[in-house]
Amino acid sequence: MMNNDIQTFLKKAGDSACYVLCLLDVAFSDNRPFDLVYCLQTIVNKGWVRSDFYVLRPDLILQEFTGCKWEVFKAGADYVPARNEYEIDYYERGSIGHFDRPNFHPIVNSRTVKEGRLASKRICRKVV
């Protein structure tokens, strides 16, 4: 069943959910099928993401959809991820920021990625 105001919810996701989409790309990197709208509504309803899609608990988002504990940390642009780590890149162009992954692009041909600079990385790894 869809929530009321789903169109406004999805518009906000389209405008601002690049980090969330990159986290879901990590969570479903094993190519399992998933319901994107369900995932977005779940993480907002649980309070791990604000209604404007600002991410508060990336570790719990990954745990929800993988069943494993995760740690997520901010690293410098020059950080080289280990084999067991997943990379999410953060680009800046003026006052605009955008998250992107090496093999997943929430916005194909993003001006922020093409014309901006790699400012930092978010590194995700399972806790063993």
Can you say where each PLM-predicted feature lies in the sequence?
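Active-site nucleophile-adjacent alpha helix/oxyanion-hole segment immediately C-terminal to the catalytic cysteine
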Residues: M1-V49
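Conserved active-site-adjacent core of cysteine acyl-enzyme catalytic domains
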Residues: F28-V127
